[in-house]
Amino acid sequence: MKICKACSSCMVRTYVDGNIIFRCSCGESVQGDSQNLLVSSKVYHTGEMEDKYKIFIKNAPFDPTNCQIKKDCPNCHLDYLTQICIGSQKIIILVCRCGYMSNRG
C-alpha cells in the first residue's frame, strides 16, 4: 500500500504491462518496486476457509464491531445473527452465539 504524496489518500495497486502502478483518485500515479511484489497467494475453498478461520468464526458473535442482521436463529430463536465476510472471495457467513452457522448468507 502506498499513500499519495499529493493528497494523502490510499493509492490502489494496478498492473500495466507487467509493472505495478499505484494510482490515486486525484490522478497521481507512482511506479511500484520490488517491495510491492506479492510473493505467494492461495485461494481457499469454502471447507479450507472454515478451517483456517475457525477461531474467528467462533468468536464473531461476541465481537460488537461485526454486523448484526435481523434474522432469527433457527437453532436458539435469537432474533439476530452476526454476519461476517471472510477470505478474498468475500464469503458471507451467518453465525449465532449458540454456535449455529450458515454460509448461505
Curated annotation (Swiss-Prot):
Keywords: Virion. Belongs to the asfivirus C122R family. Coiled coil: none annotated. This is Uncharacterized protein C122R. It comes from African swine fever virus (strain Badajoz 1971 Vero-adapted) (Ba71V). The keyword Protein biosynthesis does not apply. It is found in: Virion. The keyword tRNA processing does not apply. GO terms for cellular component: virion component.
